[in-house]
C-alpha cells in the first residue's frame, strides 16, 4: 500500500470525523458562539484521539468515554482557574506560577491513576493555564470566559458523539466472543506445553502471550461496558473470566515448575490425556469432560493439586463463556461463580516516574512563562499553552519523546496547511456556510485517513491546523496574528521537547525493583490465618504489575520468571492449610511489616538490611512450622519462596 493510498476500512471513520467537524462548525456559527474554533477543535480531538490510539476506527463507546473525560477535565480545570484567579488576582506573576504548579500536579496524578482515566487530569492541568493566560488583559471576564469555554467544549463533544452514532458505531462484542473462545484454546495448549515439560523459552513465550491476551480482553471488556448498558451481564461474566484466565496461567506454569523437582507427580494418564491436540473451544470442552472423569476415577488426593485447580477453573470458564456469547440471564450456578472473592486494587509502582513527570511539566511551563515575559512576544502565551498541552499529554504515555516529536511534526505541517486555508480557502468560502463546511470536511477526511495509519505528525497537524485558522465570530484576517499563532505553536512544542530531553527519566530500574519487591510482599502477605485476608483476590493486581514489568523490560525473561514464581508462591501459600495459633499469627504480622519496610526503604543500605531481616525471619518461620507440625503443603512452598529470595537477593535490593 502506498503512502498516500486510502484503504476501504479507513473511509468510514474519515467520513465520521469530517461529519463531527462540520456539525460542530455549523452549530457554533448558528448559535453565534464567540469562538466556534473550540467546538470544532474539541470534536476533532475527541473523535480522532481514540482512532490514533487504536490505529483504526475505534470501538463504540470509546469516543463517548473520551468525551466524558474531556468534560470532567474541563470543569475541573475551570474551577481550579477560577479559584486561582480569585485568590491571586493582585499578583499576576504568582498566579501564573501557581498555574504551572497546578499543571504539574495534574500530570503527577495522571501518571498514577488508570491510563484510561488519566486524560481528564492531564486536560484539567492545561485548561486552567489556558484560562489564566487568556484573561490576563481582562481578568473581570474570567467567569464569562470559563462558561463559554465549557459550553463550546460540551457542544464539540456532543457533535463528536452524534457523528459516531450516525455512522453505525463499531461494536466490540464480536471481537470479545472470538477472543473468549481463542483464549480458552490457548490456555489448554499452554497446559499441554507445561505437561510435556519441553523448551522453557517456548513455555515463556506462550504464557507471556497469554498474559497480554488476557490484558487485551480486559480492555475489550471496558469498551463493551462503555458501549451499552445492555451488555451489563456480559460485563459481569467477563470480570470473572479475567480472574479465571489468570488462574489457568498460574496453574499451568506451576505444573511446569513442579516437574523440575517432582516429575513423577504427573502420571502417565494425564500425559496421555494432554497429548490430544485441540483446535477449537469445542475440542477443549470434550477434553475437559474426559479430564473430569479421570479425576473422579483417580480421586482428588491422587490428582496433582495444580491439575485439579486448573480443571475446576477451566470448567467455570466454559460455563461463563457461554453466558458471555449469548448474553443470557445469569443462572443460579453462574451467580455462585460470580459472587467470588473481593478483588484487591493494585498500588502504583511508578511514584518516582510520576514525580519526574511533575517536574517536567512544571519546569517546562515555568520556562515558557519566563520566555514570554522576557521576550514580550505577542504569541508567547500561545507557546506557553502548547508547552502545557504537550507535556501534560505526553507524560502519561510510554514514550513522551515521540509524542513531543509528533507534535513538532504536526505544528510544522500545520503552517503551510493553515496558510492555504487562511489565505485562499476560508476568505473565498466564508460567505457560504455550505462551502466553508465542505472545505473543513475535506481537511477532516484526509487527516482522518492519516490518523488511522498513525502517521507521525497527523494528530498534531489536525489539532494545530484547526487551532490557527480563523474560525472566530466574526472572522478577522490579520496575517501577523496568524503567523504569530503558528510560530508560537512550533516554538512551544520545541521547548517542551527540549525539557523532556534535559529532565531525564531514570525511574525505569527503580520501578522494576519496586514491582519485584511488591511481588515478594504479596507472597509474604499470603502467609496468614486471617480468613478475610485469605479470601482476597490478588491475581488481577499481581498480573497487572507483571504486565507493566513486561512493558518496562521487554525481553527480560529472568525478571518475568522471578515475578511469575512469586505469583505462584502467593497462590500456593494462600491456599495452604497453615496451622491456626497466636504464635504464627503474630509472626505473620511481623513478616508483613518487614516486607513493607523493604518496599518503602529510601536507599539501598536500608533495603538490604530489611531484606536480610526478612530472610532471617523466613528461616525462623520455617522452624516454627516444623515445631507446629505443619503439613508439606505448607512447608514446601515456604521453603521454595525462601530459596528464591536468597537466590535473587541482589536483583531485589540493588538499583
Curated annotation (Swiss-Prot):
Bilayer-spanning residue ranges: 13-33, 38-58, 69-89, 93-113, 121-141, 152-172, 370-390, 407-427, 431-451, 459-479, 482-502
Subcellular location: Cell inner membrane
Major location (coarse): membrane
Keyword Cell membrane: yes
Keywords: Cell inner membrane, Cell membrane, Membrane, Transmembrane, Transmembrane helix, Transport
The family this protein is said to belong to: Belongs to the aromatic acid exporter ArAE (TC 2.A.85) family.
Entry function: Forms an efflux pump with AaeA. Could function as a metabolic relief valve, allowing to eliminate certain compounds when they accumulate to high levels in the cell.
Annotated protein name in UniProt: p-hydroxybenzoic acid efflux pump subunit AaeB
Species per Swiss-Prot/TrEMBL record: Citrobacter koseri (strain ATCC BAA-895 / CDC 4225-83 / SGSC4696)
Record gene name: aaeB
Amino acid at each position: 500500500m502506498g503512502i498516500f493510498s486510502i484503504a476501504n476500512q479507513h473511509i468510514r471513520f474519515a467520513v465520521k470525523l469530517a461529519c463531527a467537524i462540520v456539525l460542530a462548525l455549523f452549530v457554533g456559527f448558528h448559535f453565534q458562539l464567540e469562538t466556534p474554533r473550540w467546538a470544532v477543535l474539541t470534536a476533532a480531538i475527541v473523535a480522532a484521539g481514540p482512532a490514533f490510539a487504536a490505529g483504526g476506527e475505534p470501538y463504540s463507546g470509546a469516543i463517548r468515554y473520551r468525551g466524558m473525560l474531556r468534560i470532567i477535565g474541563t470543569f475541573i480545570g475551570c474551577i481550579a482557574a477560577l479559584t486561582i484567579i480569585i485568590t491571586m488576582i493582585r499578583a499576576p506573576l504568582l498566579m501564573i506560577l501557581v498555574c504551572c504548579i497546578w499543571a504539574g500536579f495534574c500530570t503527577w496524578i495522571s501518571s498514577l491513576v488508570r491510563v484510561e482515566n488519566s486524560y481528564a487530569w492531564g486536560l484539567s492541568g492545561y485548561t486552567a493555564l489556558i484560562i489564566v493566560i487568556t484573561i490576563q488583559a481582562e481578568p473581570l471576564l474570567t467567569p464569562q470566559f470559563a462558561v463559554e469555554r465549557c459550553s463550546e467544549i460540551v457542544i464539540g463533544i456532543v457533535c463528536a458523539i452524534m457523528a459516531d452514532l450516525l455512522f453505525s458505531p463499531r461494536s466490540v462484542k464480536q471481537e470479545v466472543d472470538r477472543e473468549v473462545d481463542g483464549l480458552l484454546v490457548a490456555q489448554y495448549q499452554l497446559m499441554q506445553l507445561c505437561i510435556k515439560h519441553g523448551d522453557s523459552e517456548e513455555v515463556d513465550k506462550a504464557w507471556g502471550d497469554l498474559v497480554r491476551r488476557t490484558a487485551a480482553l480486559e480492555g475489550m471488556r471496558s469498551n463493551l461496558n462503555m458501549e451499552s448498558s445492555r451488555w451489563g451481564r456480559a460485563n459481569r461474566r467477563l470480570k470473572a473470566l479475567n480472574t479465571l484466565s489468570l488462574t489457568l496461567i498460574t496453574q499451568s506454569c506451576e505444573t511446569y515448575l513442579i516437574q523440575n523437582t517432582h516429575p513423577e507427580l504427573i502420571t502417565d494418564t494425564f500425559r496421555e490425556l494432554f497429548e490430544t491436540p485441540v483446535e477449537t473451544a469445542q475440542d477443549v470442552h470434550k477434553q475437559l469432560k474426559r479430564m473430569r472423569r479421570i479425576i473422579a476415577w483417580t480421586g482428588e488426593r491422587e490428582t496433582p493439586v495444580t491439575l485439579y485447580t486448573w480443571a475446576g477453573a477451566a470448567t467455570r470458564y466454559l460455563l461463563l463463556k457461554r453466558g458471555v456469547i449469548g448474553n443470557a440471564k445469569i443462572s443460579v450456578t453462574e451467580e455462585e461463580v460470580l459472587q467470588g472473592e473481593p478483588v484487591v486494587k493494585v498500588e502504583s509502582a511508578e511514584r518516582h516516574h510520576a514525580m519526574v513527570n511533575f517536574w517536567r511539566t512544571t519546569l517546562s511551563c515555568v520556562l515558557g512563562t519566563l520566555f514570554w515575559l522576557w521576550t514580550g512576544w505577542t504569541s508567547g502565551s500561545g507557546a506557553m499553552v502548547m508547552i502545557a498541552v504537550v507535556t501534560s499529554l505526553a507524560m502519561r504515555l510510554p514514550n513522551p519523546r515521540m509524542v513531543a516529536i509528533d507534535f513538532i511534526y504536526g505544528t510544522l505541517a500545520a503552517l503551510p496547511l493553515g496558510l492555504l486555508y487562511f489565505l485562499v480557502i476560508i476568505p473565498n468560502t466564508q460567505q457560504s456556510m455550505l462551502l466553508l463546511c465542505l472545505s473543513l470536511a475535506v481537511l477532516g477526511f484526509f487527516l482522518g485517513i492519516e490518523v488511522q495509519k498513525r502517521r507521525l505528525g497527523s494528530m498534531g497537524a489536525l489539532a494545530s491546523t484547526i487551532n490557527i485558522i480563523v474560525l472566530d465570530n466574526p472572522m478577522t484576517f490579520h496575517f501577523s496574528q496568524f503567523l504569530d499563532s503558528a510560530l508560537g505553536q512550533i516554538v512551544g512544542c520545541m521547548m517542551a521537547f527540549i525539557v523532556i530531553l534535559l529532565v531525564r527519566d531514570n525511574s525505569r530500574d527503580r520501578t522494576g525493583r519496586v514491582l519485584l519487591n511488591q511481588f515478594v510482599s504479596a507472597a509474604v502477605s499470603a502467609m496468614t490465618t486471617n480468613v478475610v485476608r485469605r479470601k482476597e483476590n490478588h491475581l488481577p493486581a499481581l498480573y497487572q504489575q507483571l504486565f507493566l514489568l513486561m512493558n518496562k523490560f521487554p525481553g527480560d525473561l529472568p525478571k518475568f520468571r522471578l515475578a511469575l514464581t512469586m505469583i505462584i508462591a502467593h497462590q500456593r501459600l494462600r491456599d495452604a492449610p497453615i496451622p491456626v495459633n497466636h504464635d504464627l499469627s503474630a509472626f505473620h504480622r511481623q513478616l508483613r511489616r518487614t516486607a513493607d519496610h523493604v518496599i518503602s526503604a529510601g536507599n539501598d543500605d536500608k533495603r538490604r538490611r530489611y531484606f536480610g531481616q526478612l530472610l532471617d525471619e523466613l528461616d525462623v518461620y520455617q522452624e516454627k512450622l516444623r515445631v507446629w507440625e505443619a503439613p508439606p503443603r505448607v512447608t514446601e512452598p515456604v521453603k521454595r519462596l525462601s530459596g528464591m529470595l536468597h537466590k535473587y537477593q541482589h536483583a531485589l535490593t540493588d538499583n
